Regions:
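Positively charged, low-complexity terminal tracts
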Residues: 1-84
Length: 84
């Protein structure tokens, strides 16, 4: 196993504030995957049409997405065990 490094993460004030998303779309082509994070605005639906806005797009290696999915599953399972 490779030596672990400690990352020093820096972020702009805008990125630190975060962005709200209530939906996502994942697509994979070859070695890369894309996650589109959306805000679906149900309050302004007109008939069958519901407006949705892309709030962020993340493109990453598919291998990293697989690692992320495993990490998310572990994290959510632990969270649910604690009773949310």
């Amino acid at each position: 196993m490779a030596d672990e490094v400690q990352l020093r993460v820096e972020a702009s004030p805008e990125n630190l504030a975060g962005t709200y998303s209530n939906a996502s779309i994942v697509s994979t082509t070859g070695a890369e995957s894309r996650i589109d994070f959306l805000y679906v605005d149900h309050a302004n639906a007109q008939g069958d049409e519901v407006p949705a806005y892309l709030v962020s797009r993340v493109i990453m290696p598919t291998t990293e997405l697989a690692h992320m999915a495993e990490t998310l599953n572990d994290h959510i399972a632990k969270h649910l065990e604690q009773g949310m």
